[in-house]
Amino acid sequence: MTALFQQLPSVDKILKTSQGSQLITEFGHTAVVAICRELLTQARQFIKKNNQLPEYFSNFDRTFVEIHSRLQKQNQVQIKAVHNLTGTVLHTNLGRALWSEAAQQAALSVMQKNVSLEYDLDEGKRSHRDNYISELLCKLTGAEAACIVNNNAAAVLLMLATFAQGKEVIISRGELIEIGGAFRIPDIMEQAGCHLVEVGTTNRTHLKDYRNAITENTAFLMKVHSSNYQICGFTSSVSEEELAELGREMNVPVVTDLGSGALIDLSQYGLPKESTVQEKVAQGVGLVSFSGDKLLGGVQAGIIVGKKEWIEQLQAHPLKRALRCDKVILAGLEATLRLYLNPEKLTEKLPTLYLLTQPLKQLKINAMRLKERLESRLNSQFDIQIEASQAQIGSGSQPMERIPSVAVTIAEKTNVKLSALSARFKQLSQPIIGRMENGKIWLDLRSLAAIETLLNTLDEL
């Protein structure tokens, strides 16, 4: 075994070779030394366990191939672009909404230049970073003011911490949600230092339940969008409009966590109807929070709109600074919101809406092209068909609703397993992510952003 250890080259010997010099030129001295040390440590462990040299130390050429491979892998960006063929348009694990061209350009511009982020060009003095977007949001929603934080969970936390610390928040039992990542409304309330008061039952809550729970220690009445589930059957709930009327009568504010945050009526495009922010503001809700990267179709942000005096208190809370957005996010959000000033062009300009409204005819054309390319690359190893599919919006938006779609399905017909093909898909330069269902791989075209790029990627198979 000692002889095997002696066959291992030193780091210095590796670096002094011509190949070592080339590696240093390409990747830098520090990175090359670190990988060499890592490789030698692993080789010693391998010798102790197997009483032989690892393959990559059988000769110098193999050693340098291994070092080069590891250095390349180390330099690869780990957050990679993928082809979304899951049929879930707003897929949380795949980054949710695609940014519009306008948002991308706005973000790139502020990355490269100094900008008037907190500077009033008219007055020549400091301003607030939310001002530009606040004016735009007020115009779009009818609210008096707005506040921007880094996601909707942060928006809920800020509202609770500002108005309900040490006080009671009344909420229906049927709205005590948990979404992905074990985010629970009761946990957020606990973190904010407020007391949860549950009213009604899981399936039925009435206005009298809220009324009877109000005390002098009530901070506000809260409604929460049910997000990723739906209670059906023998149910009853109280609308924001009814709750707002009760709030005015009892002098208690009403707050809504709307979640998805639609700014337009989706039913005009034949999609499932979702409550809009404008509707909640018009119904008299004091504060409405929602996400920027769901139905809004933009950047990850938490947006709060509502009454000016309450928004001013949110802006003044110490948590606001900890939760604020940077210039890139704010620029992307502003550019996205400006698209809504011309709603007739939204299906062309906003990727999320474009994907959701693609006609089935176009999806079938894309499916035929995808099927042909797969058949040419997979050489009859699988049964490849075009089938009707059911896509979904995703990210908690209309969880029970489905959108007609078209998919290319792949089933086994030889001894080559689907699991092996799925693994190959994920090893491509731009991995292909579909879904497994009924013993087939489903590649749903509804959620695909670029058919040409996908076809080019498949040439790597």
UniProtKB/Swiss-Prot annotation:
Where in or outside the cell it occurs: the entry states: Cytoplasm
Enzyme class, broadest EC rank: transferase
Keyword terms of this UniProt record: Cytoplasm, Protein biosynthesis, Pyridoxal phosphate, Selenium, Transferase
Name where it mostly resides: cytoplasm
Which reactions does this protein catalyse?
A: L-seryl-tRNA(Sec) + selenophosphate + H(+) = L-selenocysteinyl-tRNA(Sec) + phosphate
InterPro entries, A to Z: PyrdxlP-dep_Trfase (IPR015424), PyrdxlP-dep_Trfase_major (IPR015421), SelA-like (IPR018319), SelA_trans (IPR004534), SelA_trans_N_dom (IPR025862)
This entry's Enzyme Commission designation comes to 2.9.1.1
Where does the record place the modification N6-(pyridoxal phosphate)lysine?
A: 294
Q: Which GO terms describe its cellular component?
A: cytoplasm
Named from the GO MF annotations, one term is: L-seryl-tRNA(Sec) selenium transferase activity
Cofactor(s) needed by this chain? pyridoxal 5'-phosphate
Q: Name one GO biological process term.
A: conversion of seryl-tRNAsec to selenocys-tRNAsec
Pathway(s) this gene product operates in, as recorded in its UniProt entry = Aminoacyl-tRNA biosynthesis; selenocysteinyl-tRNA(Sec) biosynthesis; selenocysteinyl-tRNA(Sec) from L-seryl-tRNA(Sec) (bacterial route): step 1/1
Which family does the record assign? Belongs to the SelA family.
User: What is the role of the protein in this entry?
Assistant: Converts seryl-tRNA(Sec) to selenocysteinyl-tRNA(Sec) required for selenoprotein biosynthesis.
Q: State the name under which the record lists this protein.
A: L-seryl-tRNA(Sec) selenium transferase
Q: Report the source organism.
A: Haemophilus influenzae (strain PittEE)
